């Protein structure tokens, strides 16, 4: 089937999905969860082929980690799908209403966006996340995954199609572009007669491509340097655990810590404990001169001087930038200079300092006394996410069900004519 034919089929499917009852959509999601469990061995075997091919082609450890599916991760995906079933369906809900002077009742009601195109790289879980959230919100989707995940995605798409068949929803509700031809990405980006929104999930190059070529509204997200600032009033003992969690728990995640900013008044005090923990976790520290001297004196085992672009780098690995700053205003100045748009945090016991950071940071998600790792649909109680938007229009942060809807105005009256 040509891409244009897929677009037309998706548009037609979106009309049926828009009026599908919540119970019917939930039935499809439950069938999807059951099929994932039934086909676990097939899915993991397909993923093993992708992992083997990835190693042979020289993929980084960070990319391989994103690509990996195992029993635990698959169980998490199943749980996320079932969580989506329990969430309220935003479609049809009334946002607000009022009665005008002429007697008309005017309201805004949530509706599906229509057809959503999603282009993503080495994350097979995205296939299920997108399908589940789009189905729940009555949106048709056209998916294009990376070649690194081809076998995994083919197995997952079969699961989705089986669930759609069981529940009688259109097969074109969720479609996957199987061809690795990159020209199809450019074609998808210009199919504005059928596709209403494009969501890229991948690196900066993918986002730039979509932004430059698309004639369809694009949700930019996922990429961004995440920072954590340790204020002079912070509990330095407890701070080490938060820094460790933000950097080490899953370094390949887009919400993992990239740059640590230390207030100059506590830098010398916290560095020994920081170095001990980072040495233990095999983290490479990349530091500007003040931080470098302190880290070197404390015995940092993997340490190098920061280059011109290091503080603009999303590491996605066990590497951490470290810088000493004068105060919270200097920390904010650093954030503003270095692409802080995703997840940023402050550790402080000073409420005024915390409030200043919250208001001044331009990030999609800002944390006080917490790890950056919480920027996630499941952690936010959204069930899953289609993306983490770092732009300011339409949606921001983890995009769950509500962010996959628009609204329409509804006027109800008694045979009213305009005077």
From Swiss-Prot:
Annotated EC: 1.2.1.41
Keywords: Amino-acid biosynthesis, Cytoplasm, NADP, Oxidoreductase, Proline biosynthesis
Pathway: Amino-acid biosynthesis; L-proline biosynthesis; L-glutamate 5-semialdehyde from L-glutamate: step 2/2
GO biological process: L-proline biosynthetic process
Reaction(s) catalysed (UniProt annotation): L-glutamate 5-semialdehyde + phosphate + NADP(+) = L-glutamyl 5-phosphate + NADPH + H(+)
Coiled-coil regions, chain positions: none
Annotated HAMAP family: ProA
Protein name: Gamma-glutamyl phosphate reductase
């Amino acid at each position: 089937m040509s891409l244009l034919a897929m677009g037309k089929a998706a548009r037609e499917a979106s009309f049926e999905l828009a009026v599908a009852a919540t119970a019917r959509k939930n039935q499809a999601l439950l069938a999807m969860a059951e099929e994932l469990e039934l086909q676990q061995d097939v899915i993991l075997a397909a993923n093993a082929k992708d992992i083997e091919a990835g190693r042979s082609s020289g993929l980084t450890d960070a990319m391989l980690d994103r690509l990996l599916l195992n029993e635990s991760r698959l169980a998490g995906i199943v749980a996320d799908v079932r969580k989506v079933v329990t969430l309220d369906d935003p479609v049809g809900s009334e946002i607000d209403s009022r009665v005008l002077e002429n007697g008309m009742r005017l309201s805004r009601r949530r509706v599906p966006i229509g057809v959503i195109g999603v282009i993503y790289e080495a994350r097979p879980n995205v296939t299920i996340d997108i399908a589940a959230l789009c189905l729940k919100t009555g949106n048709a989707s056209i998916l294009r995954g990376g070649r690194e995940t081809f076998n995994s995605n083919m197995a997952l798409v079969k699961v989705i199609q089986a669930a759609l068949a069981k529940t009688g929803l259109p097969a074109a509700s969720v479609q996957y572009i199987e061809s690795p031809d990159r020209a199809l990405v450019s074609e998808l980006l210009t199919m504005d007669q059928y596709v209403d929104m494009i969501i890229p999930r991948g690196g900066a190059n993918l986002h730039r491509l979509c932004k430059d070529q698309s004639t369809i509204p694009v949700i930019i997200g996922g990429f961004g340097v995440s920072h954590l600032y340790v204020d002079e009033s912070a509990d330095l003992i407890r701070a080490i655990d938060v820094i460790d969690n933000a950097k080490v728990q899953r370094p390949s995640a887009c919400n993992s810590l990239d740059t640590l900013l230390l207030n100059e008044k506590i830098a010398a005090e916290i560095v020994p404990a920081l170095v001990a923990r980072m040495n233990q976790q095999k983290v490479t520290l990349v530091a500007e001169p003040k931080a470098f001297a302190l880290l070197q004196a404390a015995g940092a085992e993997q340490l190098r001087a920061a280059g011109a672009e290091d503080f603009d780098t999303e590491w996605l690995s066990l590497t951490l930038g470290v810088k000493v700053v004068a105060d919270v205003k200097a920390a904010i100045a650093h954030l503003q200079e270095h692409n802080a748009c995703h997840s940023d945090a402050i550790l402080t016991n000073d409420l005024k300092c915390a409030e200043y950071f919250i208001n001044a940071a331009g990030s999609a998600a800002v944390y006080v006394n917490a790890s950056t790792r919480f920027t996630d649909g499941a952690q936010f109680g959204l069930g899953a996410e289609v993306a983490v938007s770092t732009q300011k229009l339409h949606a921001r942060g983890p995009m769950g069900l509500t962010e996959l809807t628009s609204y329409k105005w509804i006027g109800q009256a008694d045979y009213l004519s305009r005077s």
